[in-house]
UniProtKB/Swiss-Prot annotation:
Source organism (scientific name): Rhodopseudomonas palustris (strain BisB5)
Annotated keywords: Decarboxylase, Lyase, Pyrimidine biosynthesis
Domain of life from the UniProt record: Bacteria
Function: Catalyzes the decarboxylation of orotidine 5'-monophosphate (OMP) to uridine 5'-monophosphate (UMP).
Alphabetical list of InterPro entries matching this protein: Aldolase_TIM (IPR013785), OMPdecase (IPR014732), OMPdecase_AS (IPR018089), OMPdecase_bac (IPR047596), OMPdeCOase_dom (IPR001754), RibuloseP-bd_barrel (IPR011060)
Protein name (database record): Orotidine 5'-phosphate decarboxylase
EC top class, as a word: lyase
Reaction(s) catalysed (UniProt annotation): orotidine 5'-phosphate + H(+) = UMP + CO2
EC number: 4.1.1.23
Name of the gene: pyrF
Amino acid sequence: MAQADPADRDRLIVALDVPSVDAANAMIEKLGDSVGFYKIGYQLAYAGGLPLVEKLARAGKKVFVDLKLHDIGNTVARGVESLNSLGATFLTVHAYPQTMKAAVAARGDSGLKILAVTVLTSYDDSDLADAGYRFGVRDLVEARARQALAIGVDGLVCSPEEAANLRGIVGPDMALVTPGIRPAGAAAGDQKRIMTPARAIAAGASHLVVGRPVMEAADPKQAAEAIVAEIAQAT
């Protein structure tokens, strides 16, 4: 396969949802230059994976630290400062005003971009009702997106189904990072609001988070390259 355009390659974020640093390093080695952007979430971070952020950054890779910070402002700010020092590119916080304000202030004018999580892509209207909300996913996502834009957050994490509507709300410059991406024929897993890579890009997503379709593929590098090719065709 021809070498991918780095701009297209970096729109794919591979989720390193593995239980150990050794497993993460093995997958990174398999993927080689086919992937330029990785996500480290709870599982790997709590298994000693945070130093991998700095290692990947030194190797010229981008890293999305998906810890969904949500605490009092001072605690959030200190966490942002620590993660920024490791060289992270993206960091998630929950889309509550105090949390977002603290994260944006602590980020300053560094290269770290703060992403606000609107509503988890595993949630639907019935889940919100169970949690006591009196309105649905769409209304909550829109309200939180407008708050995030006003506060100065750099991007949103949203389902691909919401990307087109949110792009109209936040404009062309804000990052829209979408999990719930499944190539045609892939199992949905625990995601309820999913879309193929090409459709998500066409809908307005700036970056696609893909885990199992790459991590569990017989040939992970080939799977990643196929997704990047689909991104390039949709751009």
